[in-house]
C-alpha cells in the first residue's frame, strides 16, 4: 500500500479549461485548482451544488482530508480514509445524495480541498 503522499497525480494540461491569478494575500503561494461542485454528494462536508472549490495541489493529503481524486475512471470530491487492515483507501461520500463509498488500492489524488466559496441562494 502506497503512502498518501505517493498518490499525488498530475493534471493533464489538456484537462485545464482556463487559468486565473488568485490574490496571494488571500490564498498564499499555493498552486490551486478551482472547480465547481456538481450535485449534493458532499453536503456533510459543507460542499453544496454550485459551490466553488479551491484545491491545493501542493498540500500532502492526510487520512480524513477532503480531496479531489480519480478512481475507476471518474473524478470525485471525497474524504480519503486509510484502511490499513485491508491495505486500501476509502473515498467516502457524505451527503444527501446517498452515494457509495469507493474502496481502491491506488486512487490518483489531484489535491486537497483548501477553501470553499459558497454559492448564495436567495
Predicted regions and their residues:
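Short, positionally conserved secondary-structure boundary motifs
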Residues: 1-43, 60-63, 74-75, 82-87, ...
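Hydrophobic beta-strand signal
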Residues: 34, 54-55, 68
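A short glycine-leucine-enriched loop at secondary-structure breakpoints
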Residues: 44-48
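Structural motif
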Residues: 50-51, 65
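Short hydrophobic/aromatic-rich beta-strand motifs
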Residues: 67-68, 80
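Short, solvent-exposed secondary-structure boundary/capping segments
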Residues: 87-94
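Flexible, small-/acidic-enriched active-site or ligand-binding loops
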Residues: 94-100
Amino acid at each position: 500500500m502506497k503512502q498518501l503522499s505517493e498518490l499525488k497525480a498530475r493534471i493533464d494540461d489538456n484537462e485545464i479549461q482556463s487559468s486565473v491569478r488568485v490574490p496571494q494575500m488571500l490564498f498564499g503561494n499555493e498552486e490551486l485548482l478551482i472547480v465547481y461542485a456538481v450535485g449534493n454528494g458532499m453536503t456533510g462536508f459543507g460542499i453544496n451544488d454550485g459551490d466553488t472549490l479551491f484545491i491545493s495541489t501542493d498540500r500532502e493529503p492526510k487520512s480524513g482530508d477532503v480531496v479531489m481524486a480519480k478512481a475507476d475512471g471518474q473524478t470525485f470530491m471525497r474524504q480519503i480514509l486509510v484502511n490499513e487492515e485491508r491495505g486500501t483507501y476509502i473515498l467516502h461520500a457524505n451527503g444527501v445524495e446517498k452515494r457509495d463509498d469507493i474502496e481502491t488500492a491506488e486512487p490518483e489524488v489531484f489535491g486537497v480541498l483548501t477553501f470553499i466559496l459558497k454559492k448564495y441562494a436567495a
